[in-house]
Amino acid sequence: MGKGFFNVPIAVNEPVKSYAPGSPERDAVLKTYKALFNSQVEVPLYINGNHVTTGNTRTMSPPHDHKHVVGTYHLAKQSHVEEAIATALEARKTWSQLPWEHRAGIFLKAAELIAGPYRDKINAATMIAQSKNIHQAEIDAACELIDFLRFNVQFMTDIYAEQPESTTEAWNRIEYRPLEGFTYAVTPFNFTAIAGNLPACMALMGNVVIWKPSDSQVYSAKVIMDVFEEAGVPPGVINVVFGDPVMISNTVLASPDFSGLHFTGSTYVFKELWKQIGNNIHNYKTYPRIVGETGGKDFIVAHRSANAKQVATAISRGAFEFQGQKCSAASRAYIPSNLWEDVKRYVIEDVKSFKMGSPEDMSNFITAVIHEGSFDKLAKYIDGAKADSDAEIIVGGNYDKSKGYFIEPTVIVTSNPKYTTMCTELFGPVITIYVYDEHKYVETLKLVDETSEYALTGAILSADRYAIDEATKALQNSAGNFYINDKPTGAVVGQQPFGGARASGTNDKAGSAQNLLRWVSPRMIKETFVTPVDYRYPFLG
Ligand code: NAD
């Protein structure tokens, strides 16, 4: 910064619009939805600011209407990925030297573009691409992405302001340099906000990026790129390639200039990428930063003192919103025997009241799961539960992929606390419940801690403070985001930094300064004012 210590706007969370019947935002988003749904878009690669078409394309279809085509996207060859890397490294020469206030200005502008002129489009695109109902689209594609962009600017300046002590003899300064080389963002299908944030936060800190979105999110990724372009992200700073993830990752990770991976997705893929980075370690110019937020097997534990209606609501919302396709979605619950009959009745009532169908019909709470692979996997586990003697489906259990990938919200009750669906991440609208002896709370907490390899989110519901304290201690390492008397989903940027440990990731807390710190390499500068001219110290006489 040259000529001032600039204050950035104080970050505030974007208010969530209601989309209630009769509201102007409801009409506007539906109009945009219809226009997008009934037209076709062509999505190019983005390399050095150019829209690159390769002739090798794949079609895009909404999960709730999979025979309907809303466009095509172009697939990269290895040479495109290599070009994107070369381009990024060239762009780095100017981008990494640009004063921070200009980087801040670009991403603050992106936030306001989404809050205003692009809001309907990014929400409608997310409803189409990922089959989100309007509320789920609004809290993700609009609000969370806006929040990431605004708060990251504030976090960046907080980091820059973190400086060492100086003395009268020497002035100590830390410069938060971007990483040397280029970075790689690999993003999941389920959150448009995560897709935008992973490349944007690295670019904000002065890095250049190759971004590989999920095949199932390309349609809404295009809107993110439209916004970044209009906001003024210069050519070559964020380059986007679609296509074979293995080829793209092999090409990226083979480059000696690869300097950081920002990944969100499944645990297996992340571990494979980590392994590959390890295998290539002798080839890199620097030690690459590795940040990954991955799977979860998120829990709800109710204590015998809990309110049954509150427990049931935490299950209905926590497990089934966005068809359970949130990394934080509750997928196993432990209910004490004294509450079970009431919780069961309320949950069944709730689930039976859910309407399922296209997000265009705004009375639908449940829409489709993301793709056929996910549908088939969920159907297999549901069939398994129907056949297994230690499992019982108490509501749901049907599925139909004739028009869209629709899985009925399903509640499995098991007598075996280690039943397969108590341990495995299914990533769909299925929760498994284990009813425990109300007097075996301590043993149950131990069980919760030991049942899964993951440690992302979890919730305790209780009216008893001692029981809450007991759970907080016993489950200290079982969740990176722990909720007391709430559902385990719905983290808000700037309020609940998000991430888990164990197999759930590196826990670098998206939506916090901690995450941004991973994308800089500090340089310590000591400036001595009166430089010594004699090597002898006084003790030498
Ligand atoms: P996924 O692992 O299938 O895909 C994630 C990304 O990795 C995509 O871009 C995909 O194309 C890419 N990929 C897939 N195979 C690859 C390979 N062999 N090499 C390189 N890249 C590859 O995950 P998904 O289905 O998109 O998302 C769901 C998963 O993401 C769940 O496990 C969920 O828990 C997790 N998730 C975690 C968080 C979190 O914050 N912890 C947030 C969202 C999603």
PLM region descriptions:
Residues 227-232, 254-256, 260, 267-417, ...:
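ALDH superfamily catalytic-core signature
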Residues 1-69:
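Hydrophobic face of amphipathic alpha-helices that form TPR/SEL1-like repeat modules
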Residues 127, 146, 156-310, 503, ...:
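Rossmann-like NAD(P) dinucleotide-binding subdomain of oxidoreductase/dehydrogenase enzymes
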Residues 125-132, 164-168, 361-367:
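Short linear capping/connector segments at secondary-structure termini
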Residues 1-9, 14, 18, 64-72, ...:
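Conserved C-terminal structural/oligomerization subdomain of aldehyde/semialdehyde dehydrogenase
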Residues 54-55, 59-61, 66-160, 445, ...:
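Glycine-rich loop-to-alpha-helix module at the N-terminal edge of alpha/beta enzyme cores
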Residues 67, 88, 103, 206, ...:
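Residue-level signal for inorganic ion chemistry
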Residues 62, 74, 138-141, 187-188, ...:
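Active-site proximal loops enriched in glycine and acidic residues that flank catalytic Cys/His/Asp
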